[in-house]
Amino acid sequence: MANIKSQKKRVLTNEKAHLRNVAVKSGLKTAIRATREAIAAGDKAAAEAAYKVAAQKLDKAAGAGVIHKNQAANRKSGLAVAINAL
């Protein structure tokens, strides 16, 4: 454990941020999985609706610094290509 007061505060802040980031990443995975399942089922309307949610979550995560903006763009692009192939 840290001895310096500011470092003790940073440990708590980092722990909160870590928990928040884990929750955001979990939501991302769920949204992407829902999109991929709709694509696998061949349901274009459901896939597009799920993609809209996933794209929004990806953009928010990138904006918050949870994932890199290029990673968000790559994931959105991959999902869009799969949906357009339906």
UniProtKB/Swiss-Prot annotation:
Pfam families in UniProt: Ribosomal_S20p
GO biological process: translation
Family under the similarity heading: Belongs to the bacterial ribosomal protein bS20 family.
Superkingdom classification of source: Bacteria
Keyword Ribosomal protein included in the entry's annotation: yes
PANTHER family for the chain: 30S RIBOSOMAL PROTEIN S20, SMALL RIBOSOMAL SUBUNIT PROTEIN BS20C
Protein name: Small ribosomal subunit protein bS20
Known role: Binds directly to 16S ribosomal RNA.
Gene: rpsT
Keywords tagged on the record: Ribonucleoprotein, Ribosomal protein, RNA-binding, rRNA-binding
A GO molecular-function annotation: small ribosomal subunit rRNA binding
GO cellular component assignments: cytosol; small ribosomal subunit
InterPro entries tied to this protein: Ribosomal_bS20, Ribosomal_bS20_sf
Residues of the signal peptide: none
